[in-house]
């Protein structure tokens, strides 16, 4: 048998079938760096409309984990897609560098007490730099393009100085206030915590009912209409923090609730109890009392001003009115310790009650506190409960499990503790109302983000921005020692401090002698040594980065972070921006869910489910991780596991194989010389170009709307269905067997060229390494990188009419039914390959009209050796119906010989003496002018 291999146009390409991403990706990275790709993109896009995705700074501590890898990948997809859309879309990465975790790491390594404050801060700075280098390497290895040589760091001297300037503007605009307010306090940190540093965990706590005795029992009884009685009156409170009782200054009742006077016997003594009417039964059940009488009821506002004796201190406390009182649990009477709770603080403020805080920064009672002096607060619960029991004031005690605030770093329970702190006042100058109004102007993705952050802002207390730590940006203020007022020239003084910090770091403030700035006034002022909350540091990036860097702008087009940032960075950025310039720093905000395992559990060493991005990159490649990130629905929790990553790897392989097919059939195609005019294209090729163009419109729209899973699905389906199992399958015969430079082959190559040009750009934002690798093998002159181009727009006008589109859709369905039937016959051993089969299609008028247009070329669409069509009502006994109404099939094994070149079984094989083992079509294609195709 003659070998006709040399007469075929077999695929050729140096583009490797095996991706070998872990080895090949670093080579691409090196090429990007040699090319200075990021700078080239910036130069190429100069003068184009800006699109700014502002990078929320990750914390400079530890290697990148899967959450931060997911974050940076999504951002990179957005930025690259906007670049392909023609925008100038710079990406300036940043890092959050101050705060407790870095302090703790340095303290652990070097010890805090062994170093001066300045040396300790320098050690923190050095540690943060080392962590930034690690994370920078991790992010670059993921293929994230950005200004990695010039990131913003919140510890850069210039950034620290600008943060002080931002604070100065907030001071000048009247948003800063000082107060002794209760804040979340971590005894282990020795500092206040921000809302975003608080996490809730279950905790076992004592729940006690404590009786406060009315000083004038007779007056109380008379208010309830009870006369001629001598029984004492108790007002029971219910609390899970008995340790706060030394700080009690009042008992709160709700003005509109109804309260009952309940007569009973407790501890073998008659007693009257004042309880919220709705809670009488549950309270008496708790006290183990079945026999009791209700004597009248009053609304809470009638109880205001009644005097009560503190249960163990020589202190008279009033009943006051508070809207925060509920009937969800307890007694309807709320123990009020203004130093240990925000609601307590606010209600006490109305009554001008003292803020009595007996707890120090270490979470211990100050030494002269009655009974519990020097004790840690949680250990003080027990002696207080014992004392209450001994004095007859303890009505009930039990242990309950409840959700309780904990330090995000130490995982230890927090306390509310009143300390002198600096706050951004939510109700000063209408900040809260302006924030709520601005939230409505922002586009929130998903849409529920608006309600979430709106509720948080509506409910949040004043923002405590001060911390008592060493490693941070100072709050450079002077307070008058007598009046407590800020220096009248504070903003101007802060600018001078900012200039010093810009040259010498934050040490300049801590080392500063006040006389340098204040002269003789220095003796009258106290220098503030607190530092700023790290959420303030990162919250003013709009001022310190977006506003200051020439290539950026404010407001940013989008902020993109995890949904936990509704109470973190999104909020701190919004509030500082409004306090400075009275508008939001972003036009839109996109959030994603936490990265969890396949069972919805958080990543944890104890569960053994931690997957490190470095391991994924090392084993599968960054592009597989990027494809996983794009494929996930980020609006909910994002699942990851080895199995899920394997599926991403399989999908990647299909995409790569499609690209390889395209490239391997364009090896001899020169777009300048070989492109076929649209009016000469084979109909199937025109359909393929039109389908590609239509899909591109959908893909670009999906990129614009950040619908990455839809893009992933569209590309995956394109590779496996419309292209992989239909178009590319059909044209193989034409590509391989038609005349090398003949119209049928060049028509197919023209379509493949357009498909490849579009396809490589579609995948570029997602699997960037692979796209740029493909780009190097594409035919024709081109830029050195796909990222220096835009979406492909040089499509010919291959538009199809609605009728033509419908016809091809029907042909897709018909071919699918034929394929299923052939597969069944193959599995049953009735045929070998599809080319051993001859197919008769029995079609109704509608389908017949479509199929008949293909004529002799029907067999090429079905990839069978012979195919014919007959009316549906002429079905033979051997025919069987399909799932497509109006279509039946009959499949027979061809009786003809196989062509040695195209492998089709044709009656013409053996008919041409000089080429007895070839069909007439192959003789024409190999040795004569070649066949012509019109449809397929």
UniProtKB/Swiss-Prot annotation:
Belongs to the class-I aminoacyl-tRNA synthetase family. IleS type 1 subfamily. It catalyses: tRNA(Ile) + L-isoleucine + ATP = L-isoleucyl-tRNA(Ile) + AMP + diphosphate. This is Isoleucine--tRNA ligase. IleRS has two distinct active sites: one for aminoacylation and one for editing. The misactivated valine is translocated from the active site to the editing site, which sterically excludes the correctly activated isoleucine. The single editing site contains two valyl binding pockets, one specific for each substrate (Val-AMP or Val-tRNA(Ile)). It comes from Coxiella burnetii (strain RSA 493 / Nine Mile phase I). A motif ('HIGH' region) lies at residues 58-68. Keywords: Aminoacyl-tRNA synthetase, ATP-binding, Cytoplasm, Ligase, Metal-binding, Nucleotide-binding, Protein biosynthesis, Zinc. It comes from the Bacteria. Catalyzes the attachment of isoleucine to tRNA(Ile). As IleRS can inadvertently accommodate and process structurally similar amino acids such as valine, to avoid such errors it has two additional distinct tRNA(Ile)-dependent editing activities. One activity is designated as 'pretransfer' editing and involves the hydrolysis of activated Val-AMP. The other activity is designated 'posttransfer' editing and involves deacylation of mischarged Val-tRNA(Ile).
């Amino acid at each position: 048998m003659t070998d006709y291999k040399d007469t075929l146009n077999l695929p050729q390409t140096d583009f490797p079938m095996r991706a070998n991403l872990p080895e090949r990706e670093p080579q691409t990275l090196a090429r990007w760096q040699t090319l200075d790709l990021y700078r080239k993109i910036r130069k190429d896009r100069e003068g184009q409309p800006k699109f700014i995705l502002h990078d929320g700074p990750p914390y400079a501590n530890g290697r990148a984990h899967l959450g931060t890898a997911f974050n940076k990948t999504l951002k990179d997809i957005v930025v690259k897609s906007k670049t392909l859309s023609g925008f100038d879309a710079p990406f300036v990465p940043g890092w959050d560098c101050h705060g407790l975790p870095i302090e703790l790491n340095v303290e652990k390594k070097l010890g805090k007490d062994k170093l001066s404050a300045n040396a300790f801060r320098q050690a923190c700075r050095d540690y943060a730099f080392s962590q930034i280098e690690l994370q920078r390497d991790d992010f670059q290895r993921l293929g994230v393009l950005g200004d990695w040589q010039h990131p913003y760091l919140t510890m850069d001297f210039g950034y620290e100085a600008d943060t002080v300037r931002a604070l100065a503007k907030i001071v000048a605009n009247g948003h800063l206030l000082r107060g002794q307010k209760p804040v979340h306090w971590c005894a282990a940190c020795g500092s206040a915590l921000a809302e975003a540093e608080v996490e809730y965990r279950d905790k076992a706590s004592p729940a006690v009912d404590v009786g406060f005795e009315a000083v004038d029992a007779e007056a109380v009884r008379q208010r309830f209409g009870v006369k001629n009685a001598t029984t004492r009156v108790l007002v029971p409170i219910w609390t899970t923090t008995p340790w706060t009782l030394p700080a009690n200054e009042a008992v709160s009742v709700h003005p509109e609730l109804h309260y009952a006077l309940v007569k009973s016997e407790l501890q073998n003594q008659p007693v009257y109890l004042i309880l919220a009417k709705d809670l009488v039964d549950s309270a008496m059940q708790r006290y183990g009392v079945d026999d009791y009488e209700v004597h009248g009821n009053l609304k809470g506002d009638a109880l205001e001003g009644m005097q009560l004796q503190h249960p163990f201190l020589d202190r008279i406390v009033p009943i006051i009115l508070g809207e925060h009182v509920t009937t969800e649990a307890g007694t309807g009477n709320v123990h009020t310790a203004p130093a240990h709770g925000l609601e307590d603080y606010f209600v006490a403020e109305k009554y001008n009650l003292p803020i009595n805080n007996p707890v120090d920064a270490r979470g211990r009672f100050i030494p002269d506190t009655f009974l519990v002096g020097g004790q840690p607060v949680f250990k003080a619960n027990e002696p207080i409960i014992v004392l209450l029991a001994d004095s007859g004031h303890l009505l009930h005690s039990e242990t309950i499990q409840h959700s309780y605030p904990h330090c995000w770093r130490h995982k230890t329970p927090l306390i509310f503790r009143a300390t002198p702190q600096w706050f951004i006042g939510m109700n000063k100058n209408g900040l809260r109302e302006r924030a709520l109004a601005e939230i409505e102007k922002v586009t929130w993705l998903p849409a529920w983000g608006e309600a979430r952050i709106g509720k948080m802002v509506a409910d949040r207390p004043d923002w405590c921005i001060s911390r008592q730590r060493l490693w941070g940006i100072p709050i450079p203020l002077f307070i008058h020692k007598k009046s407590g007022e800020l220096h009248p020239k504070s903003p101007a003084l802060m600018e001078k401090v900012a200039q010093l910090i810009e040259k010498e770091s934050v040490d300049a403030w801590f080392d500063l002698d006040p006389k340098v700035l204040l002269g003789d006034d220095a003796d009258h002022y106290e220098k503030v040594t607190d530092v700023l909350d790290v959420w303030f540091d990162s919250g003013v990036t709009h001022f310190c980065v977006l506003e200051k860097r020439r290539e950026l702008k404010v407001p940013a087009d989008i902020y993109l972070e995890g949904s936990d940032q509704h109470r973190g960075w999104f909020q701190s950025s919004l509030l500082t921006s409004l306090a400075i310039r009275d508008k939001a720093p972003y036009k839109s905000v996109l959030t994603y869910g936490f990265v969890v395992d396949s069972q919805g559990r958080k990543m944890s060493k104890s569960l053994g489910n931690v997957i490190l991005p470095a391991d994924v990159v090392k084993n599968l490649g960054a592009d597989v991780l990027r494809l996983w990130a794009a494929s996930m629905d980020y609006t909910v929790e994002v699942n990851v596991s080895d199995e899920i990553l394997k599926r991403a790897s399989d999908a990647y392989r299909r995409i790569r194989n499609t690209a390889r097919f395209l490239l391997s059939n364009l090896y001899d195609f020169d777009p300048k010389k070989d492109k076929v005019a649209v009016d000469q294209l084979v109909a199937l090729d025109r359909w393929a170009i039109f389908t590609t163009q239509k899909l591109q419109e959908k893909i670009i729209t999906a990129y614009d709307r950040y619908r990455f899973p839809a893009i992933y699905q569209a590309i995956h389906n394109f590779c496996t269905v419309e292209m992989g199992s239909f178009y590319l399958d059909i044209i193989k015969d034409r590509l391989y067997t038609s005349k090398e430079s003949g119209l049928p082959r060049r028509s197919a190559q023209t379509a493949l060229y357009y498909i490849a040009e579009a396809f490589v750009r579609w995948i570029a934002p997602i699997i960037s390494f692979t796209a740029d690798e493909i780009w190097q093998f594409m035919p024709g002159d081109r830029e050195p990188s796909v990222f220096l181009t835009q979406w492909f727009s040089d499509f010919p006008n291959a538009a199809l009419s609605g009728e033509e589109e419908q016809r091809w859709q029907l042909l897709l369905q018909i071919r699918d039914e034929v394929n299923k039937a052939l597969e069944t016959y193959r599995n049953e051993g009735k045929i070998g390959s599809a080319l051993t089969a001859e197919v008769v299609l029995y079609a109704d008028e509608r389908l017949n009209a479509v199929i008949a247009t293909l004529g002799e070329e029907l067999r090429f669409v079905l990839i069978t050796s012979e195919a014919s069509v007959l009316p549906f009502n002429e079905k033979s006994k051997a025919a069987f119906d399909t799932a497509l109404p109006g279509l039946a099939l009959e499949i027979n094994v061809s009786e003809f010989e196989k062509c040695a070149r195209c492998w089709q079984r044709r009656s013409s094989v053996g008919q041409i003496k000089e080429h007895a083992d070839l069909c007439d079509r192959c003789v024409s294609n190999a040795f004569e002018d070649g066949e012509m195709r019109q449809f397929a």
